[in-house]
Amino acid sequence: MKVKKILYLLVGAVLFVGQSAVCEDIRIVGEGANSKLSLTLEQLSGCRKKEGLRFYSVLKSDLTRSGWFKVLTKPKAAIEVKGRVFVSGGSVVAECNVVAPATGRCYLSKSFSAPACSTRKLAHTVSDAIVLAVKGVPGIASSKIAMITSKSGKKDIVICGADGQDVVKLTHDGAPCLSPTWSPKGNALYYTSFFRGFPDVYRIDLNSGRRTRIASYPGINAGADISPNGKLMALTLSKDGNPELYVRNLRSGKLTRLTKTISAAEASPSWSPDGRQIAFVSDTTGSPQIYIIKASGGKPRRLTFRGKENVSPDWGPDGRIAYSSRRSGRYQICVVDVEKRTDKQITSEYVDHEQPSWAPDGRHIACARTEGYISGVYVLDTMGDAQVRLTQFKGDWYAPAWSP
């Protein structure tokens, strides 16, 4: 039963249906951990014309979605974005100065440009630059989210923006697929597909669209995750009979087996940010729990003890691990600080929240939420903002993977 349980976790998705300092005198909106800096775009000229208006609308939405700012409609705020937006030849140009008027501090002074057909992309770039300059963390506006869509029994992988727009379909074969994950540079996507009738691992080059089968050992090939340096791939293989955790050198093809369990199985590997450890799921104690093991091998250390089942670990950029925990009959998203050994439950509604994936800002998490047998991808804010539905289309959407 142990193996059957963990194999369900491995391939169940196939059947799934449903830091910079801020001066003390800067005005803060709100209280507690989710306090926001007030920010205004009202001193940005050129936003009443067609492209400028579109730029303003997207930038305002991006900055609000970042969670760090309270965007005001009046001209004065703790952070003011000044400058102008204009069209020059075939390009849209945004000249931006981001300042704190109370102190005179200039966070950012830069000119950005993009083809006239890429105004949305330009706004995303500016938003990320503002977040990085003011808060010292990566922005998420330009990031992408891969996920699986299921319609009329056909499953494919798609990519969309962090705002749910610009949806692009990557696969068109309708074959059962699961576990999409990004390369560290964001130029390729790895996933498991039953395209040839067996669970094999594939790689899609996002520049050329070329698909390559890279792991097709006998039995299960699943849960691929690429190391931060891009040289190694952790995955689950059953080529020797039992689903075990392996690391494969992507250049030489050399395999290193990390686990050796007789009656249990391992799944869902996730690399630590420094590439030295791997989090994974094992049912060696009778129920699926999360463990950590050195990337070179050794004795695994159990990480989770609360919850009947703990699955789908995703190691975030700041060292915390998000996972799905079955508590009070439902799967909820939780976050554990590996060093402090503290555990925080992020969701609490009596619906299932599964398959968490960290955003590059270390604040937001994408997950699959299932309610009434219908699944959609939602974005959670670990600092308290309300969750937001990302997918607004028909069918089921799940297994999100946020780009680096």
Q: Language-model features: where?
A:
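A structural "domain/chain start" motif
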Residues: 22-61, 65
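Amphipathic beta-strand/beta-sheet edge segments enriched in Tyr/Trp
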Residues: 77-129
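Structural motif
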Residues: 91-93, 153-158, 198-202, 242-246, ...
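Residue-level detector of Asp-centered blade-edge/turn motifs that repeat once per structural unit
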Residues: 139-141, 184-185, 228-229, 273-274, ...
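Hydrophobic beta-strand positions that form the internal "hydrophobic ladder"
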Residues: 145, 189, 230-233, 275-279, ...
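Short loop/turn segments immediately following the C-termini of beta-strands
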Residues: 150, 194, 199, 238, ...
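Multi-bladed beta-propeller domains
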Residues: 161-178, 205-222, 248-266, 293-309, ...
